Amino acid sequence: MINHFSVLGIKPSAKEDDIKKAYRRLSNKYHPDKLLGASDEEKEQASQQLERVKKAYEVLSDPKLRNAFIRDFNNVIVTDPNSAMRELWDQFYP
């Protein structure tokens, strides 16, 4: 399960304004139009990361979705720690 808080680089206690600021900062960072001189591969990776950022913002900016995410995230049982670590690693180094 992707941790939307980690994607945006914020704490679970973040306020709505902090969520917006993180979203704006990251969407500017990963937007393809901002990546002048980047290779096609780098642009593709940035595009994938931008989609993660958009999804995280969509979930965390809506109070109902945010509460459901927190509830579900707290109920996740890690059955394969290696897989969980790979997923976490891939969030930061796609």
From Swiss-Prot:
Induction (UniProt): Part of the atcJABC operon. The operon is constitutively expressed, and expression shows only a very slight increase at low temperature.
Gene3D superfamilies named among the record's database cross-references: DnaJ domain (1.10.287.110)
Keywords, sorted A to Z: Chaperone, Stress response
Entry annotated with the keyword Mitochondrion: no
Region annotation Essential for interaction with AtcC: where it falls in the sequence: 74-94
Highest taxon of the lineage: Bacteria
Paired cysteines (S-S): none
Null allele phenotype: Deletion of the gene leads to a dramatically reduced growth at low temperature.
Domain J: residue ranges: 3-93
Miscellaneous comment text of the record: Stimulation of the ATPase activity of DnaK is much higher with DnaJ than with AtcJ.
Functional description taken from the UniProt entry: Involved in cold adaptation. The J-domain is functional and can stimulate the ATPase activity of the DnaK chaperone. May work as a co-chaperone of the DnaK system to support cold resistance.
Subunit structure: Interacts via its C-terminal extension with AtcC. Does not interact with AtcA and AtcB.
Note on domains (UniProt): The J-domain is required for stimulation of DnaK activity. The C-terminal extension of 21 amino acids is essential for AtcC binding and to support cold resistance.
Name of this chain's protein: Adaptation to cold protein J
Gene that encodes it: atcJ
